[in-house]
Amino acid sequence: MAEYIMAVQNGRNIPTEDKIFGSSRRANEMKAERGEDAVINATIGALLNDDGDLMVLSSVDDTFMGLEPEEYASYAPIGGTPAFRKAVVKAAFGTYQPKGFVEAVASPGGTGAIRNVIANYSCPGDKVLTSDWHWSPYGTIASEIGRSIATYEMFTEDRKYNTQALQAKIEELLAVQDYLVVIINTPAHNPTGYALTVEDWEKVVEILRNVAPEKHVALLVDAAYIDFAGDEEEQRAFLPVLETLPANVLPIMAYSASKTYTIYGMRCGADICLAPTKEIAEEFRRVCEFSARGSWSNCAKAAQSIIARIFSDEALLARVTEERAEIRDMLLARGKAFEEEAAKVGLTIVPFDGGFFVSIPCDNPDALSARLEQEGIFLVPLAKGLRVSVASVSEEKCRLIPARIVAAMEAEAQAQKNADEEAAAQA
């Protein structure tokens, strides 16, 4: 029986349901059946308070409520309003003043930003490089426009960032393709919570300095969670390192205003380049705007107006920054609690520094996730393990989950042992 009736597959692997949204749907169904207290839903990639309600910065909400109709109902320019494009650079870079040529192009969240970089800085059929632990929609975005994902092992055996594996994979891919997009999601990497150090970045840049001059690399920094990783200025300490790259390597930041300003549903982000020449920066803006026009036309104006207003009012900006710091501290406390309890019960987690997510390496994550769901604990199964959203559950629940995972692992291992013994007995 054909998998498709009228639609054309076009080489894509299209699941019947998104894993993350599917897990969350099942959690909500169990809540409706058994009650709120019977379920821990650690799948959601948004900040929720301890009662499970969405946390929205009141300062941002007040700004939204104060918009004039012209600020939300009229079309925005394809690349974003001038005020937004100026403000989003400040939002993304903080106090850092780039020395190169900067251009920003609006996108519907960080997802749109990633899409446009892949579309414009790689060729159909090319592989896009990222780490083995990565946000799974990278693969969806790539396949949707005729590319695919290649990965390198993110961590060494001593749990350090694996620059040797990165270098080997870059060399392997550039031996067969002239263009390469390298995606590095940091700080507060999704799904692990890891953040590259400045020393890590210096090694990455050294690797890219050795790329042959006739090759072209777009270094895409997916900084979606940068403002929830820790001190906002410390998390941007790597930015000057990016401006030491050679002319054939273009650093681009995919920035998510949707997350930083807790307006997830407004889908607001930007691609921001740090180009060595004016010509490269202008080309960046032109090609990204062209792709935007052919994909979503232009982005919703309301969020752009909110960001522009915030950065035009120092008192409002201070209020937003202070309020975000409060919920960031809550988030970091949850992550620390999970990390502490994992250590107590002997649960290995992937190196974690901060952010929305923690990951647990394991065999057969789908089976383990299904077992935990039977007990009312909903996590996201990945290729190499399980993802826990500490953003969406209380600190108390963050302390409960590790022991429950260990128990489920032991039960799953025993079930597999029993199955193997039964199979051997029947052989």
What does each of the following model-derived ranges do?
Residues 87, 243-324, 328:
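Conserved core segment of the aminotransferase class I/II
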Residues 3, 10-109, 416, 426-427:
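N-terminal small-domain helix-loop-helix segment of the aminotransferase-like
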Residues 68-215, 226-245:
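Conserved core of the PLP fold type I
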Residues 220:
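Generic enzyme active-site microenvironment
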Residues 223:
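Walker B catalytic acidic pair
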Residues 49-50, 321-372:
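Conserved PLP-binding catalytic core of the aspartate aminotransferase-like
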